């Protein structure tokens, strides 16, 4: 077991490099019928179909394992860390750069289709709008995140150094951005809400209903989650039936039996607050164009100063795909979830309420959050340009001859039309230092 545990990081690294070098062409290079297909798990309109399966059930169905002891994962979706890192709380943080932003370089596999890439970018946009976290194009940085459609939904906790893998299989994206947000919170250094040290005041773990051998996934731990009060509505909370043996609840809320746990829709207020506290995001962190967010200290939702660049680009993509999609395709009608609909954090559960119906309602269109129409100010933005601009797909380190050329995402952003208000698309990506 010890040998296998030490080999898993190397195995994941090799699989990641293989996926990057053998990735399929992007959707923009497909002809005709490619743009008319609808990925499994989505409606023709592009809205995600709600599934009963959460992260543990998805991984149990995709990853063959007998017990957690034989797995490279702990708590269902966390890559097993080395023993000394288990004792660490804050030394695996991502560093803060110039301007008060925390930049996390990322690389996206070519195997994702356009709709899946849009879901991932939507999750990036939520962090950009509410925190000082910025996911930027990989351009030779030493530490970066490689996002791949491997078997399951999993990631490591915090910055591990070098390339670290985040797996988001197609099944993980069927509900929309929720599972992506969950795994990215792990990347930022956060563990599961139901495993925090004070959880017994808020939930009861039904040990008799846990799948035999999987009890280890419910061990309490000291973690960065303790920066805020316990939150039933956290995107880091597992649902009632996690690792259930006979279909009975394994996690039972104590304060109210009807509260919804395990939501996979938005970052909750406490999720945003804990990110801002761990990374010391200032009250107002403007970017190079004077935009940013304001963190309110009274526990209420964070109020963005303006719509982020990524949100504007997502709007433009939605508008563009709606007008240029081939006949019969309805992917252009996808409803992109509005950001900022996070549920209220539970400062004290008895006095707080949580609307289950809020999760069942369709997400608010981004157009409703902006006075300008979708795609305004981006007349020359083509669907192909945007798909190239969404994410870098090939590490420059693998192709030395490309070192003097701009990264695909950078080159595409530079060819985009200016956004309203003189905001240059992808400006924070162009600021990433080159080797």
Swiss-Prot record:
Keyword Protease: yes
The enzyme's E.C. designation: 3.4.-.-
Gene Ontology annotations for the cellular component aspect, listed alphabetically: cortical granule; cytoplasm; plasma membrane
SMART domains per UniProt: ZnMc
Residues annotated to bind Zn(2+): 182, 186, 192
Cofactor(s) named in the record: Zn(2+)
Transmembrane domains' residue ranges: none
UniProt cross-references to SUPFAM superfamilies, sorted A to Z: Metalloproteases ('zincins'), catalytic domain
Cofactor comment text: Binds 1 zinc ion per subunit.
Active site per the UniProt annotation: 183
GO biological process, one term: negative regulation of binding of sperm to zona pellucida
Keyword Lipid metabolism in record: no
Disulfide bonds: 132-281, 153-172
Primary location group: cytoplasm
Activity regulation details: Inhibited by wide spectrum metalloproteinase inhibitor batimastat (BB-94). Also inhibited by EDTA.
Function: Oocyte-specific oolemmal receptor involved in sperm and egg adhesion and fertilization. Plays a role in the polyspermy inhibition. Probably acts as a protease for the post-fertilization cleavage of ZP2. Cleaves the sperm-binding ZP2 at the surface of the zona pellucida after fertilization and cortical granule exocytosis, rendering the zona pellucida unable to support further sperm binding.
Protein name (Swiss-Prot/TrEMBL): Astacin-like metalloendopeptidase
Organism whose genome encodes this protein: Mus musculus (Mouse)
Gene name tied to this protein: Astl
């Amino acid at each position: 077991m010890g040998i296998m545990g030490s080999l898993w990081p190397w195995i994941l690294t090799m699989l990641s490099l293989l996926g990057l070098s053998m990735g399929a062409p992007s959707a923009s290079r497909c002809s005709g019928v490619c743009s008319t297909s609808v990925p499994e798990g989505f409606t023709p309109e592009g809205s995600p179909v709600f599934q009963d399966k959460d992260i543990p059930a998805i991984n149990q169905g995709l990853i063959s394992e007998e017990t957690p002891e034989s797995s490279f994962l702990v708590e269902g979706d966390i890559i097993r860390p080395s023993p000394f890192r288990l004792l660490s709380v804050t030394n695996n943080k991502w560093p803060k750069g110039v301007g008060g932003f925390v930049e996390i370089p990322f690389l996206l596999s070519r195997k994702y289709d356009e709709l899946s890439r849009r879901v991932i970018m939507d999750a990036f946009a939520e962090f950009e709008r509410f925190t000082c976290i910025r996911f930027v194009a990989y351009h030779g940085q030493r530490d970066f995140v490689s996002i791949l459609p491997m078997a399951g939904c999993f990631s490591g906790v915090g910055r591990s150094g070098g390339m670290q893998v985040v797996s988001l299989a197609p099944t993980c994206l069927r509900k929309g951005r929720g599972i992506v947000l969950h795994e990215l919170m792990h990347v930022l250094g956060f563990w599961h809400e139901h495993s925090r040290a004070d959880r017994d005041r808020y939930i009861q773990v039904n040990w008799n209903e846990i799948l035999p051998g999987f009890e280890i996934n419910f061990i309490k731990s000291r973690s960065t989650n303790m920066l805020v009060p316990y939150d039933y509505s956290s995107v880091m909370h597992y649902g009632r039936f996690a690792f259930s043996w006979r279909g009975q609840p394994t996690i039972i809320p104590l304060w109210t039996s009807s509260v919804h746990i395990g939501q996979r829709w938005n970052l909750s207020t406490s999720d945003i607050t804990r990110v801002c506290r761990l990374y010391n995001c200032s009250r107002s962190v403007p970017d190079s164009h004077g935009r940013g967010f304001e963190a309110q200290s009274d526990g209420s939702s964070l109020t963005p100063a303006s719509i982020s660049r990524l949100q504007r680009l997502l709007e433009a993509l939605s508008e563009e795909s709606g007008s240029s999609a081939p006949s019969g395709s309805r992917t252009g009608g996808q409803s992109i979830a509005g950001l900022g609909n996070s549920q209220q954090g539970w400062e004290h559960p008895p006095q707080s309420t949580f609307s289950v119906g809020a999760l069942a309602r369709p997400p608010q269109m981004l157009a409703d959050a902006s006075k300008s129409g979708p795609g305004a100010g981006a007349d020359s933005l083509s669907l192909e340009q945007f798909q190239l601009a969404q994410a870098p797909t090939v590490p420059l380190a693998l192709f030395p001859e490309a070192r003097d050329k701009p990264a695909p995402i950078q080159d595409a952003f530079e060819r985009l039309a200016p956004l309203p208000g003189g905001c240059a698309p992808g400006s924070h990506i162009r600021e990433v230092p080159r080797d």
